Amino acid sequence: MNDPRIIVALDFPDQCTALNFAAGLDSTLCRVKVGKELFTLAGPQLVEKLMKLGFDVFLDLKFHDIPNTVAAACSAASSLGVWMVNVHALGGSKMLLAARQALDGKRTRLIAVTLLTSLNQNDLSELGIADTPETMVQRLALLAQRCGLDGVVCSALEAVSLREVTGEDFCLVTPGIRSFGDGNDDQARIATPAMAIRSGASYLVIGRPITRSPDPLGALRRFNDEVASVL
């Protein structure tokens, strides 16, 4: 079974641009991620069109609400046929359990967001959280695992410790992936593909290094080659 490790973030301002870009990729080499901006603009029909192009879709809407609302949202996402959907672990165990129950018996994978990769120690302090990012991520990841979720989003820098405490079957989805020489953009905890895979990441979310490349398919192939070199 083909299991591409790279998830390309389709962070585009409109459906036409996103679909034209996706059509130039190879669905055997990647999955695609649709986030809040694009989904709000284009809606479920965009997901359906991407699936018709052969892509598995990660619907990155980070649900965070009362348990019943999140459960209904997860069920609706699954009815679209998406491969993966996410929720905020900070929603707590009742919300996480409701989301898990809503997807029981369905193919859609459910993961939790621990801490956004843009947050550093100073940001946590401003929120009244004394823990380090690493400690907070581990606590939230273990909560998600206890609630039966398939995995979490985490930076590559936290993946080593998370892999140790969650085991081999827990899915670690890692954003903030760059090649050496790329800018950090707005993500504080970044890594190269090889670093992330060696750290224990299951899937890598890559956006601008592919979407802003003059040769997106070539960039995707290079990232895949780097992943393959350490598997």
UniProtKB/Swiss-Prot annotation:
Its EC number is 4.1.1.23. It is an enzyme of class 4 (lyase). One of its GO terms (biological process) is 'de novo' UMP biosynthetic process. InterPro entries: Aldolase_TIM, OMPdecase, OMPdecase_AS, OMPdecase_bac, OMPdeCOase_dom, RibuloseP-bd_barrel. It comes from the Bacteria. It catalyses: orotidine 5'-phosphate + H(+) = UMP + CO2. Substrate binds at residues 11, 33, 60-69, 117, 178, 187, 207-208. It holds the Pfam family OMPdecase. The keyword RNA-binding does not apply. One of its GO terms (molecular function) is orotidine-5'-phosphate decarboxylase activity. Keywords: Decarboxylase, Lyase, Pyrimidine biosynthesis. The active site is at 62 (proton donor). Catalyzes the decarboxylation of orotidine 5'-monophosphate (OMP) to uridine 5'-monophosphate (UMP). This is Orotidine 5'-phosphate decarboxylase. It comes from Nitrosomonas europaea (strain ATCC 19718 / CIP 103999 / KCTC 2705 / NBRC 14298). The gene is pyrF.
